[in-house]
Amino acid sequence: MKSRCQKGDKDLSLRVALYIKYNNGKRKMINLQKTDDVRINAINELLPPIAHLYELPITDKAAETVYQTRCEIADLVHGKDNRLLVIIGPCSIHDPKAALEYAQRLLPLRKKYEKELLIVMRVYFEKPRTTVGWKGLINDPHLDGSFDINFGLRQARSLLLELNNMGMPASTEFLDMITPQYYADLISWGAIGARTTESQIHRELASGLSCPVGFKNGTDGNLKIAIDAVGAASHPHHFLSVTKTGHSAIVHTTGNPDCHVILRGGKEPNYDREHVQAAVAQLAKSGISTKLMIDFSHANSCKDFTRQMLVAEDVAAQIQAGENNIMGVMVESHLEEGRQDKPEVYGKSITDACIGWDTTEEMLALLAKANQVRV
């Protein structure tokens, strides 16, 4: 009787254990359904960076273009070169063919003014949004809401490779911790925008980027957040990202000594002599490089693309008057002036309005002439 009872107890224990295991598992599944990914519609696999780097490897010519330009920009940031850095190009790239034509037109001017200007093409693939809208070539390369990001990343790298192979260095804005692994080796200068300058993640990112980086003042005109960002990015950081093979990883950086601030305006423009000198004083007090860049667009142009030339004229006059702390400028320029909602006109922006090619040539001539006093 005792033995049967022991056997029965064992059977009962097994049944109870299985019951508890089953019910706990079921309960866990129900809980996960209630708490995990409740607002995720779908998750699609992304090709790892190495797939694109293997298919589109950097060439010797492209590497030379990037390395040389990075060194030259670093010299500008630290006052070892008196040329003026000009970051110029479309607000955002939506048509690689038009971008290449723009580069082919810009290349002779880069050569023509190489003693006065260091011209780097603006090649922005991601568009930060205040609310919603098209987020750029990487996010939606077909402009149809299909969000073919794998194709967008490949297209971005392909364009950058072609630009650098022709000797045209590229600049871009960095928005996250993952996309730089796909094409940062082809970027000569990077920007952290006004909406992300105060973000700890972006300061950490800048500390590990291999290129010089500019931080814009805040959208309200606050310069201190950009100054703090430059200081933070110069130090080592430790953060989460992915490896070239796509694995989650902890990244340890050395710090980036080649960062600077960008004046882009805020509640009012901040490109004039008074604002520049006030910014220089703030930079000096903070103990970082007093060399700064001026964005001709955004709040400095009051969001009127035609005013970019007025800003250029003011900055050119400051340079001719002996202002040595303006080390660079940013210009939104395209083949055709203005903007459009849909890509109907070739070479015209579908995001922020840009100056056209004729005005671009005039502006570069103006800036080169003004900077002759420094070189």
Task: Write out the residue ranges for each language-model feature.
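N- or domain-start disorder-to-order transition segments that initiate the globular core
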Residues: 40-77
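Intrinsic-disorder-associated, low-complexity terminal segments enriched in Asp/Asn/His/Tyr and depleted
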Residues: 9-11, 19-23
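Glycine-rich anion/phosphate-binding loops
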Residues: 94-111, 147-155, 313
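Internal helix-turn-beta structural module
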Residues: 333-371
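Active-site-facing alpha/beta catalytic cores
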Residues: 30-35, 116-271, 275-276, 298-299, ...
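Conserved, mostly hydrophobic/aromatic
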Residues: 89, 294, 356
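Conserved phosphate/anionic-ligand binding catalytic regions in large, soluble enzymes, centered on
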Residues: 85-95, 352
